[in-house]
Amino acid sequence: LNNVEMILSYLVGAAAFNFSYMTMVMVRMTRRLQAMLLQDSLTGLPNRRVIEARLKQEWRRWARHTAPFTVLAVDLDHFKQVNDTHGHLAGDEMLVQVGQRLLAGVREVDTVARTGGEEFLLLLPDTDAAAARAAAERVRASVGDEPFRVRGQSLRMTASIGVAQVGEGDADAAAVLARADAALYRAKGAGRNRVCGADAAPAEGAPAGSA
């Protein structure tokens, strides 16, 4: 009988241990999956899903309290030449370093995201037009003023930036983002390595959701 009790006790203990271990493994796997869904796999920055969710949050805050926010759309100029000339590993390394420089130049409350390829988005809460323009110029300088040390080589890069501050004519968060993108294309068309502000949103009354 004692042997049976010992065996049963062992089996129960082993089952409890295995359950605890499997639970721990599942928790870790869940966290990794969540990170994969929310982070850019190359740079570790938030991805488009994250910044669009935060943009919607800021939009709701604007609609309720008229709290200003600004979006910066950033695109690296002629980045394809880096990949074509130095290889994709060099391009990837430069993207990581660009992300680090962008993070170093903003506040903790700001969001820096890589949204694909050589494109980044920055969300700056509680930022008026003058502060937004200054922030955009700092971002541009952080990319272009100093060369990048990539795989033993010194490589130059510049960035074009579109700036859009939320306005009463914006129907939703996507409208602010669209104006930032349009300003970015104007910066590209005007010669690159520059900051362009978005056209003001056409006023159509109070922001949605302000009632």
Predicted segments with their positions:
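Alpha-helical scaffold within the catalytic cores of cyclic-nucleotide enzymes
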Residues: 98-100, 131-148, 179-181
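Membrane-embedded alpha-helical segments, specifically the hydrophobic cores
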Residues: 1-28
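Short regulatory alpha-helical coupling segments
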Residues: 34-35, 48-68, 99-107, 125
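Short helix/loop segment flanking the catalytic signature motif in cyclic-nucleotide metabolism enzymes
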Residues: 94, 121-138
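Short catalytic/binding micro-motifs of nucleotide second-messenger systems
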Residues: 104-109, 141-154, 165, 184-186
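Catalytic-core segments of nucleotide cyclases and related cyclic-nucleotide turnover enzymes
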Residues: 130-133, 151, 164-211
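A short pre-motif secondary-structure segment
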Residues: 112-114
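Conserved nucleotide-binding and Mg2+-coordinating catalytic segments in signaling enzymes
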Residues: 35-53, 74-88, 96
